[in-house]
Amino acid sequence: MPKVLFLPHKILLPKSIECEAQTGETILTVALRNNIKLEHACEQSCACSTCHCIIKKGFFSLSGWSEKEDDILDKAWGLQSESRLSCQAVIGKSDIEVEIPLYNLNYTVEY
């Protein structure tokens, strides 16, 4: 079973939490199951950037990203080359480390 290490966050997570994950589930699913209150304004439909996270380890073990996710990420605060939407990033077989940015933009697109 892969493990997800959520790194400390000033408001949401005072200390790191390591969680077990199932291959094939999203980072957001793991966070919510472990009571990490990661925002997700669009209810996991890839229409906002509130669940933006930065993958510090294991980026290439996650599923590939879609053009839609890439477009939404362009609007995320603090975008980095290892940024993903946690509702879209599907966990593979390797352990990952996730940083939750201090801020997010509640930018939503209606399709």
UniProtKB/Swiss-Prot annotation:
PROSITE patterns in the cross-refs: 2FE2S_FER_2, ADX
Matching Pfam families: Fer2 (PF00111)
Gene Ontology biological process: P450-containing electron transport chain
UniProt entry keywords in alphabetical sequence: 2Fe-2S, Electron transport, Iron, Iron-sulfur, Metal-binding, Transport
Cofactor binding mode and count: Binds 1 [2Fe-2S] cluster.
Gene3D superfamilies to which the protein is assigned, alphabetical: 3.10.20.30
Residues the entry annotates as binding [2Fe-2S] cluster: C42, C48, C51, C87
Cofactor: [2Fe-2S] cluster
Span of domain 2Fe-2S ferredoxin-type: 1-104
InterPro entries according to UniProt: 2Fe-2S_ferredoxin-like_sf, 2Fe-2S_ferredoxin-type, Adrenodoxin-like, Adrenodoxin_Fe-S_BS, Beta-grasp_dom_sf, Fdx_isc
GO MF assignments: 2 iron, 2 sulfur cluster binding; electron transfer activity; metal ion binding
The keyword DNA repair belongs to this UniProt entry's keyword annotation: no
Domain of life: Bacteria
Any one of the GO CC terms: cytosol
Reported function: Ferredoxin are iron-sulfur proteins that transfer electrons in a wide variety of metabolic reactions.
PANTHER family found in the cross-reference section: FERREDOXIN-2, MITOCHONDRIAL, FERREDOXIN/ADRENODOXIN
Family designation: Belongs to the adrenodoxin/putidaredoxin family.
Protein name in UniProt: 2Fe-2S ferredoxin
Provenance organism: Buchnera aphidicola subsp. Acyrthosiphon pisum (strain APS)
Taxonomic classification: Bacteria, Pseudomonadati, Pseudomonadota, Gammaproteobacteria, Enterobacterales
